[in-house]
Amino acid sequence: MSFGAAGGSLPMTTREPPERGSFPLDHFGECTHVMKQYLECIKVKRENQEECRLLAKKYLQCRMDTGLFGKDDMKNLGFHGDENATSTSLSSSNDGNNNSNSSSSDNKTGGE
C-alpha cells in the first residue's frame, strides 16, 4: 500500500526560519513571573498601555539575560523612545513641584 498523494506529486514547499530564529520554551520558568505580570496587565488594561509595554520589555530582557532569546538592542525590538516617555512622565509629575518653586523664585526676582 502506498500513502500520500496519487503519483507522488506533492508540491515541494520550503519553509523559511523565523527572522529572529527560534523562540525556545522557558522550561525552568526563569522568566515566568514577568510573563504573568505582563499577561495580567494586558488582561486588566485591555490596551497597549505604557505600563504593559515596559513589562514586555522587561520580559524580553529577562529572556535575553537567561539565553532564551538572542541578545539585541531594544530599538530593534520595537521599543523606540520608551525610556524618554518614562522620563517625560516623571518630569511632568515633577513639573508641578518645579512650577511652585519657580513661581516663588519669580516672586523673589520680581521683588528685588
Curated annotation (Swiss-Prot):
UniProt key word rRNA-binding: no
Molecular function in Gene Ontology: copper ion binding
Cellular component terms per the entry's GO annotation: mitochondrial intermembrane space
Disulfide cross-links: 31-62, 41-52
Keyword Mitochondrion: yes
Transit peptide extent on chain: 1-16
Region feature (Disordered): 1-24, 73-112
Job of this protein: Required for the assembly of mitochondrial cytochrome c oxidase.
Protein name (Swiss-Prot/TrEMBL): Cytochrome c oxidase assembly protein cox19, mitochondrial
